[in-house]
Design a protein with these regions (language model features):
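N-terminal [4Fe-4S]-dependent radical SAM core
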Residues: 1-39, 45-55, 68, 72-78
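Short hydrophobic-acidic sequence motifs that mark active-site Asp/Glu residues
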Residues: 21-23, 82, 142, 180
Length: 258
């Protein structure tokens, strides 16, 4: 069953990666809007026809909502470790994303100065300077890189925009290390396509990309919830550990989540 978030701000909930996480969903509460259609996405498949007129929260509405949530949580055991942008699709698609990040930083500093601000993004808009600059301001700029080859990225992420992998890696390099790379490892099938980003060839290409990007951290993980594509295999913790060791051999920080 697909998980869709019904509120602009939700939680806090416990995150495997980010601790006590106060979620932010900038996309409509009625459906998913994303430039990827990942075979493993907990929000399910993209709708055939996205509602381009779906109402998005204004910066003023977002500020009121986040202010109320943080004021209520301040000084309690539920005070968040992270204010996390995820939700029903790609958060950077919101037309006021840069302004919303500035609002979040100001309210975080006021109510929860120990909390980090995290953005989970597929990275398809980092070529836009406004988006790049906004992501560069947050504590955890978490960008997706799910395979070493463009062929496997297209099979796993099913993008509805054209991805130039060389340009994407070059854009990630411009963060000068102020980026966290997230990768979900998976095997399976989708239609006639064989999905496997764990092959020796894919792993080697992926590692070469990491060397160029030099991320502050790499997060690797496996399927944890129901997926829209049913023919997927959850990678074992032992195999994930072996991949993590290859990242460590590059003298890069890595965390893995079974």
């Amino acid at each position: 069953m697909a998980i869709l978030f019904e509120n602009l701000v939700f939680g806090p909930i416990h995150s495997r990666r980010l601790g006590n996480s106060l979620g932010v969903n900038l996309m409509p509460v009625i459906g998913k809007i994303c430039t990827f259609n990942c075979v493993y996405c907990e929000c399910g498949w993209n709708p055939e026809h996205s509602d381009t007129k779906a109402r998005l929260a204004s910066p003023a509405e977002f500020e009121r909502t986040l202010d109320n949530a943080l004021a209520e949580l301040a000084g309690t055991v539920k005070e968040p470790d992270s204010i996390t942008f995820s939700g029903n699709g790609e958060p950077t698609l919101h037309p006021d994303f840069p302004e919303i990040i500035d609002i979040t930083i100001r309210l975080r500093d006021k109510y929860a100065p120990k909390a980090v601000i995290s953005v989970l993004t597929n990275g398809t808009r980092i070529h836009d300077k406004r988006i790049f600059d906004a992501l560069n301001k947050v504590d955890n700029n978490i960008c997706k890189l799910d395979a070493g080859s463009i062929e496997m990225i297209n099979k796993i992420n099913l993008p509805n925009v054209k991805i130039n992998l060389d340009e994407y890696i070059a854009d990630l390099q411009k963060f000068n290390g102020n980026v966290v790379i997230q990768t979900l490892f998976v095997r399976g099938t989708h239609g006639n396509d064989v999905l496997n980003n764990t092959s020796d060839e894919e792993i080697e290409s992926w590692l070469q990309h990491l060397k160029k990007i030099n991320p502050r951290k790499t997060m690797i993980y496996v399927i944890d919830r129901e997926t829209p594509e049913k023919n997927l295999e959850k990678i074992s913790g032992a195999e994930l550990s072996l991949i993590a060791n290859k990242v460590k051999a590059l003298d890069l920080d890595v965390e893995y989540y079974e």
